[in-house]
Amino acid sequence: MAAAAASPSPATPPRILLAGDANGRLHQLFKRVTSVNQSTGPFHALLCVGQFFSPDAGDGDGGGGGEVADYLEGRAAVPIPTYFTGDYGPAAPRLLAKAASSARGFSPGGIQICPNLFWLRGSARFTLHGLSVVYLSGRKGPGGPGCYSQDDVDALRALAEEPGIVDLFLTNEWPAGVVNGVDTSNAPSQISDPHGYDPVVAELVAEIKPRYHIAGSKGVFYAREPYVSDSAAHVTRFIGLANVGNKEKQKFIHAISPTPASTMSSVDIHARPPNTTLSPYISPAKSVPVEETPKRPAEDADLQYWRYDVKKQRHGEAGGNRLCFKFTSSGSCPRGSKCNYRHDEEAREHYNRNVCFDFLNKGKCEKGPECRFAHSLSDEGAVRDTKPRSERRRVESSCWFCLSSPDVESHLVISIGEGYYCALAKGPLVPNHVLVIPVEHCSSTLKMPVEAEAELGRYKDALAKYFEKQGKIAIYFEWVSQQSRHANLQAVPVPLSKASSVKKIFHLAAQRLGFEFSVVNPDGDANRARELLRSECDSKSSLFYVELPEGSVLLHLVDSNEKFPAQFGREVLAGLLSMADRADWRNCKVSKEEEIQMVDDFKQGFREFDPAE
């Protein structure tokens, strides 16, 4: 019997082997693992993704039953601790039946089916030699053995909201869209085959944001360029593995030695390789439901629900008679009849007439008089600024952009007018990245008084002349959310040679997120476009817009239940400029001394154009 691999010392990162679809060829797989372990080891674990059991129905020699049975019955030994997720194949239910029946309780770290061999069943998160590992076993399908369920998916969605970085995410199938945004001209031709891709996996990885995503089922080896997800400090690396013993000699075993994120420094976690791209995935807000599947046996299903219902109960959200926010706010819910919450058309009608959702759901609202929505059915339609004057002053005193606030970084200011001022962006995407900011505390430049538009126009004209001397043109964009505090219109200078590509790249980015921009004033009059934008803006709407070089505007009105990335504009322009490593402003911060020097340099060049001079 093979001994378990020794644990690494606390100062040494664990060494992990990854393998693709074994397809029942365990002798060949473990022979290769033994060879690698002897020559370049020791390795502490083997993680197998893709189909572990043979696709053949026979139990004889070469069949999945024959080789697996050798290990289950002790005729052969598994060389190092091995974990698999691909619990499907004709013989799999019979071979796993004993382990399934003897399993007691929930085993996130796997069910042992023989010494050193562990079945990762369902979905869960566990720790392996300090690494946080999340997995989804089975594959997309009509239900039953070997197919993951909606319960498994929901459990992972709940886990995604918990703190901590996931080091490894294991799935059997590739995430749909993983090759978006990269050059695939030198990649294996099989990646263009739709077989083996799964949109549900794409949603999950976009929410979980692991450091490594490992998958099988495509029959090829492919290591994608690292990418950075919205709001994630780290990059994600996708590795697809080939089948064991494939004729094309594609790589089916791969070694990694990642330091657990829990022990890494902030600098190391934020490190971005030069070939980092933006995330290839659509927004997880556009939920793709799992196909209708028969429920697991009651005991197993209860275990699955326990994993995410504990979180709901902890926060007082255990379904029952509570309203479904997604249905109440949008009129639809991807879980349909399987949703744990109430779908009430009458409540939706009240919500659409501005009755507070918490009032409808709980009979009270913790915000009390500060809430801007109605707290009785007879007061429908009320949307009001209920904050007392003292409260508004308190908000403004803690605002980053109010000039009277002690928190404002005044050393970044480059010009102050009557209604607007300009400042260099903190953590700029590119040099001379400017913010045009209302002097008064206002949540959007579109809500400023009409007379302030003239001054805004003068600032934009001045910036245009300043950037023109550098061979650049400014791209303006603004994100306006219901939670916005103080508006800032961002002006990012891009080379004139890139100007014609701005419209296309924003349309492509929108398509990736699952929405389409509407074009405001396609005739190209920038002033008229701003007028039309102001008519679209109301106090209840979240929106994003970008002003194109030719004068038209791309506008997206954001649904209340839509997860729109706050850094969308910056991320898209980072992609246009091949600066994905600078998409997050926190990666671009410099010292205060450097900021002061940048402001001085900007002022010297801008002085001749500054409308406030």
Curated annotation (Swiss-Prot):
Superkingdom assignment: Eukaryota
Zn finger (C3H1-type) start-end: 318-346, 350-378
GO biological process annotation, one example: mRNA splicing, via spliceosome
UniProt keyword list: DNA-binding, Metal-binding, Repeat, Zinc, Zinc-finger
Coiled-coil intervals, chain numbering: none
Residue ranges, annotated region (Disordered): 275-296
Gene Ontology MF term list: DNA binding; RNA lariat debranching enzyme activator activity; zinc ion binding
Record-linked InterPro entries: Cwf19-like (IPR040194), Cwf19-like_C_dom-1 (IPR006768), Cwf19-like_C_dom-2 (IPR006767), HIT-like_sf (IPR036265), Znf_CCCH (IPR000571), Znf_CCCH_sf (IPR036855)
GO cellular component, one term: post-mRNA release spliceosomal complex
Signal sequence bounds: none
Protein name: Zinc finger CCCH domain-containing protein 59
Organism this protein belongs to: Oryza sativa subsp. japonica
